[in-house]
């Protein structure tokens, strides 16, 4: 339980100072500085898998449409995806619990589950935002081609960087901000003349509706990703599968509420969550589940910026695959935009672009110094009190022991 910046254990009632966003960021930076070649290989596998899964996602969505429309409810796909991820998290928890050493706190105990649920309650926020975003993914396919959707999603990098700066106190160099500006230029180049003029939908110009959905499509998942990263890293010692169980459980609840809302407005016949599904939608559900699981590893062991930049690499795969299988044309604007995006990515992750810490290694920030001084003063008061008690006991009865026997 957290009150006034202090966390209290529900078991032993001990109190510690709650981690601030900046302290979470510093703790992660310290963990990252000790990263080994094994973790670097893990990051490479995560990026490779993410490129394939993210690249396949819009293509599977496009293949799921019949005559340009979805015969199934997008909310049902999101619900089945969350259920799939919950099952995966439970299976991995069982496997991990069987590999625990003697003396370790059991993962499947009720006390561990309840305590972890309290500590990870913040995961409900990104779960709700993800539920909204997953529905927007289907809406975006009605206005843009798969390759264009992937390019639009790259706009999230800039929004994520801004949110990381204010929420997690992350620092970016001028070169990295310039790299993000290059990313926006590359996306803008790809978007030139990408939407036909004069097309109407819902009585408005398609460009107007598309831009409104794009704004929501970029902001909502960016906020979800940053909050997800903060929630996972703030409880770094908690098993990622246990955290995923809460995250996906919340997501399944929110999507089920969406299904109930659909039943209220469209009638009981819409409650059939398997209605209109095909083999393509089953692949889509598996792809979305695998993509969400990979994202959790990115957020906990890497960072959100790397996750979004890895998604830009998937744009090439998406563009080539959509041109080969769906007949979409790769324009000059698209090729130029991709080139600028890769220049931006190289510049952002260049060693010269890293932020240099001006403070000495042993220096403390004001917040840390204050906590350090308060700890020292508390220790002095504690030792002084102990000395007073000792002198009091000695004057009363020198033969009486200080500690109970």
UniProtKB/Swiss-Prot annotation:
Q: A single Gene Ontology molecular function, please?
A: pyrimidine nucleotide-sugar transmembrane transporter activity
Localization: Golgi apparatus membrane
Q: Where is this region: Disordered?
A: 386-405
Q: Which residues lie on this side of the membrane: Cytoplasmic?
A: 1-43, 96-121, 165-171, 225-244, 303-322
- Tell me where the transmembrane regions lie: 44-64, 75-95, 122-142, 144-164, 172-192, 204-224, 245-265, 282-302, 323-343
Biased composition range(s): Basic and acidic residues: 389-405
Q: Name one GO cellular component term.
A: Golgi membrane
- Origin, by domain of life? Eukaryota
* Alphabetical keyword list: Golgi apparatus, Membrane, Sugar transport, Transmembrane, Transmembrane helix, Transport
Residues folding into a coiled coil are none
Q: What is its main location?
A: Golgi
Q: How does it sit in the membrane?
A: Multi-pass membrane protein
Regions of this protein lying in the Lumenal compartment: 65-74, 143, 193-203, 266-281, 344-405
Q: Does the keyword Transmembrane apply?
A: yes
Job of this protein: Sugar transporter involved in the transport of CMP-sialic acid from the cytoplasm into the Golgi. May transport important nucleotide sugars such as CMP-Kdo (2-keto-3-deoxy-D-manno-octulosonic acid) in physiological conditions.
The UniProt similarity line reads:
Belongs to the nucleotide-sugar transporter family. CMP-Sialate:CMP antiporter (TC 2.A.7.12) subfamily.
UniProt name for this protein: CMP-sialic acid transporter 4
By which gene is this protein encoded? CSTLP4
